[in-house]
Swiss-Prot record:
ADP binds at residues 353, 393-395, 397. The modification Phosphotyrosine is found at residue 708. The modification Phosphoserine is found at residues 160, 275, 535, 611, 668, 672, 681, 711, 728, 734. The gene is MCM3. Residues 727-738 have a biased composition (Basic and acidic residues). Residues 670-681, 704-717 have a biased composition (Acidic residues). SUPFAM superfamilies: Nucleic acid-binding proteins, P-loop containing nucleoside triphosphate hydrolases. Residues 295-502 form the MCM domain. Residues 662-738 are annotated as: Disordered. This is DNA replication licensing factor MCM3. Pfam families: MCM, MCM_lid, MCM_N, MCM_OB, WH_MCM3_C.
Length: 808
């Protein structure tokens, strides 16, 4: 505060006169005179002034305003009140004070919470950041009026503290007695209060230095500025930077607390928008028309070019970046347009790398991990302010990523309670808090891209997908697509991957020096609340395709062009704005395919669903088809979009399950060998050959082979051949014998008579054979008895276990 200049009355009046001349610009363009008239008609009391206009008209006064804010703003606000009174005297008397808010170019005083240092104290600064904490709105007394019944006099007292522009704070003692110790009564109707709120602004994650904690600054909002921002909003706050003395035990300590007293709060765009030129728009239109047939495949191939394969996953991530169409119906229902994807698979299949690519490509993305995140850390938390002791709301990762993407790695490491906390966010797109006396609803309209490992560490192909995934159905149904990514052993594919990885390690970007760290920043920041000096000089010509590099893209016979990352960002940004409409043809096709999906699990026995097919799947098909239409820059969702969406869902929802060969049980060595032992061994050899061929073909299809499965080698090891018993031979033969209807009916009648005579629910096989054939004219052979019992067991009429027949 050493640099602060206290103005005397003469200088204050001179400053007030300069500001009044600036506002009274009727002879010039009349901008601020019309603004003041609008302020009166809108019943407002804060005028937004552009610093550039003041600098153009009175540069000396503008510099003083930025460097000695408190006294200059007091003079500016008095001048504003005088100017309002000259236009409408009655309106000027309605409000105690009129406020001035600033905008425009602040140059070196346009800072972030990290660069806001002590040299800016008592200056006007513009701070950018994300609102992370938000206190409750409290009333603060400005003027209290007290009535003394004994003397019948009225006493008035004004209050000011260090958060106001007045240089010296008044006494905070609330009067209860007058000078003669007569009791006073407070006239609450005549007293004046103003709203007061404290928010905390944190620096933006994309601008924070890597490996350092983000810094924050407290901002004080008064009167009409309260509730201008909520947790998760990106804002620019213009205000005066001030230090407040810290007190401990009634004494002022040497450490000071700094706050920003706001005079203007401006909402920034939710997205970090890329800057567009007319040429960029023309290129985007031309690209969408010339590549209209395979534009979706072209864009999907260009996603994460450093990752080999995973074509369907890349298509799904492109759909996630484009998104569907969000709808709010008249009855209050909300249909989300965000697409959620879960990647589950073996280690080292590039799940985390895909997440990192989305972080770099999406306009707004926040990374988090399952082990390092809690449920309230992802949604919102109610915390206690250490200084005031009051409750405040703190936004989590999903609220901060509103209209963006949340990337959650190691999703399986989260606890069930924390995973349950994100259910509402994934479907409704909002967070509802009702705890500690705070009831709030925050927007969290974000897409979720999660990566997880299977339950057993690696994916077991002999178990169903649901057993491998190990997540609740209620959570899985909220993911639009669930991809199972396997590390399969295929010599040809392994050769391609090794070639690809080696090329990536040999590649070096142009101009990269030895040992240089890769730059993490983006384009040049604009040090103003607006971008008035936008020119084409800063714009580089955005190339549609990347220049082909043999190391980066490989030497293929058919050179596939890769869309550049810069053009991809701009194309996705433009495509997201389009809102396609479903055609009748595509709607009918989606409805038919949805009903087919519901019954598809009963068609083939060797496939199983990765996630439940519910009504949400129908919305998934619509969202994916809409995203495909956005990629084509189409205003309608056509049949080809619906077909592509169905193909994605078919690939993601069903996974083949292998059947394990039953291992033979070892029998005792003293059992005699049967005559057909040699034939059996030959059959086994043939079956093994067939199985090996089948598995090799499956591996080529990319569907079944597991590099850690040694079932083939186990079967090829020498095994002890076990002889067949007579019972097993009869059982096999009984499956070949077919009983006639009359013969089966006679057996059932005879069986029922045997159970009635025995007065029991179970009977042995030997006893049954004797009892049935005792009085029978045509006795039943043991093979017929086995066949009849097998038939009755299939019909759930009897149960055979260890030679005992149970009547059901």
């Amino acid at each position: 505060m050493a640099g602060t200049v206290v103005l005397d009355d003469v200088e204050l009046r001179e400053a007030q006169r300069d500001y009044l001349d600036f506002l009274d610009d009727e002879e010039d363009q009349g901008i601020y005179q019309s603004k003041v008239r609008e302020l009166i008609s809108d019943n407002q009391y804060r005028l937004i002034v552009n610093v550039n206009d003041l600098r153009r008209k009175n540069e000396k006064r503008a510099n003083r305003l930025l460097n000695n804010a408190f006294e200059e703003l007091v003079a500016f606000q008095r001048a504003l009140k005088d100017f309002v009174a000259s236009i409408d005297a009655t309106y000027a008397k309605q409000y105690e004070e009129f406020y001035v808010g600033l905008e425009g170019s602040f140059g070196s005083k346009h800072v972030s919470p990290r660069t806001l240092t002590s040299c800016f104290l008592s200056c006007v600064v513009c701070v950018e950041g994300i609102v992370t904490k938000c206190s409750l709105v409290r009333p603060k007394v400005v003027r209290s009026v007290h009535y003394c019944p004994a003397t019948k006099k009225t006493i008035e007292r004004r209050y000011s503290d260090l958060t106001t522009l007045v240089a010296f704070p008044s006494s905070s003692v609330y009067p209860t007695k007058d000078e003669e110790n007569n009791p006073l009564e407070t006239e609450y109707g005549l007293s004046v209060y103003k709203d007061h709120q404290t928010i905390t602004i944190q620096e933006m994650p994309e601008k924070a230095p890597a490996g350092q904690l983000p810094r924050s600054v407290d901002v004080i909002l008064d009167d009409d500025l309260v509730d201008k921002a909520k947790p998760g909003d990106r804002v620019q706050v213009v205000g005066t930077y001030r230090c407040l003395p810290g007190k401990k035990g009634g004494y002022t300590s040497g450490t000071f607390r700094t706050v920003l007293i706001a005079c203007n709060v401006k909402q920034m765009s939710k997205d970090a928008q890329p800057s567009f030129s007319a040429e960029d728009i023309a290129k985007i239109k031309k690209f969408s028309k010339t590549r209209s047939k395979d534009i979706f495949d072209q864009l999907a191939r260009s996603l994460a070019p450093s990752i080999h394969g995973h074509d369907y996953v890349k298509k799904a991530i492109l759909c996630l970046l484009l998104g569907g169409v969000e709808r709010d119906l008249e009855n209050g229902s909300h249909i989300r347009g965000d697409i959620n994807i879960l990647l589950i698979g073996d280690p080292s299949v590039a799940k985390s790398q895909l997440l990192r690519y989305v972080l770099c490509t999406a306009p707004r993305a926040i990374p988090t991990t399952g082990r390092g995140s809690s449920g309230v850390g992802l949604t919102a938390a109610v915390t206690t302010d250490q200084e005031t002791g009051e409750r405040r709301l703190e936004a989590g990762a999903m609220v901060l990523a509103d209209r963006g993407v949340v990337c959650i790695d190691e999703f399986d490491k989260m606890s069930d309670m924390d995973r349950t906390a994100i259910h509402e966010v994934m479907e409704q797109g909002r967070v509802t808090i009702a705890k500690a006396g705070i009831h709030a609803r925050l927007n969290a309209r974000c897409s979720v891209l999660a990566a997880a490992n299977p339950v057993y560490g690696r994916y077991d192909q002999y178990k169903t997908p649901m057993e491998n995934i190990g997540l609740q159905d209620s959570l899985l149904s909220r993911f639009d697509l669930l991809f199972i990514m396997l590390d399969q052993m295929d010599p040809e594919q392994d050769r391609e991957i090794s070639d690809h990885v080696l090329r990536m390690h040999r590649y070096r970007a142009p101009g990269e020096q030895d040992g240089d760290a890769m730059p993490l920043g983006s384009a040049v920041d604009i040090l103003a609340t607006d971008d008035p000096n936008f020119s084409q000089e800063d714009q580089q010509d955005t190339q549609i395709y990347e220049k082909h590099d043999n190391l980066l893209h490989g030497t293929k016979k058919k050179k596939e062009k890769m869309v550049s990352a810069a053009f991809m960002k701009k194309y996705i940004h433009v495509a997201k704005i389009i809102k396609p409409v479903l055609t009748q043809e595509s709607a009918t096709y989606i409805a038919e395919e949805y009903s087919r999906l519901r019954s598809q699990d009963s068609m083939s026995s060797d496939t199983a669903r990765t996630s439940p097919v519910t009504a949400r799947t129908l919305e998934t098909l619509i969202r994916l088809a809409t995203a495909h239409a956005k990629a084509r820059m189409s205003k309608t969702v056509d049949l080809q979009d619906a077909e592509e969406a169905v193909e994605l869902v078919q690939y993601a929802y069903f996974k083949k399950v292998l059947e394990k060969e039953k291992k033979r049980k070892k029998r005792s060595e003293d059992e005699s060998e049967t005559e057909d032992e040699e034939e059996k061994s030959q059959e086994d050899q043939e079956q093994k050959r067939k199985r090996r061929k089948t598995r090799q073909s499956d591996a080529k299809d990319g569907d079944s082979y597991d590099p850690y499965d040694f079932s083939d080698t186990e079967e090829e090891m020498p095994q002890v051949h076990t002889p067949k018993t007579a019972d097993s031979q009869e059982t096999k033969e009984s499956q070949k014998v077919e009983l006639s209807e009359s013969r089966l009916k006679a057996f059932k009648v005879a069986l029922l008579d045997v159970f009635r005579e025995a007065h029991a629910q179970s009977i042995g096989m030997n006893r049954l054979t004797e009892s049935i054939n005792r009085d029978s004219e045509e006795p039943f052979s043991s093979v017929e008895i086995q066949a009849a019992l097998s038939k009755m067991q299939d019909d759930n009429q009897v149960m055979v276990s260890e030679g005992i027949i149970f009547l059901i």
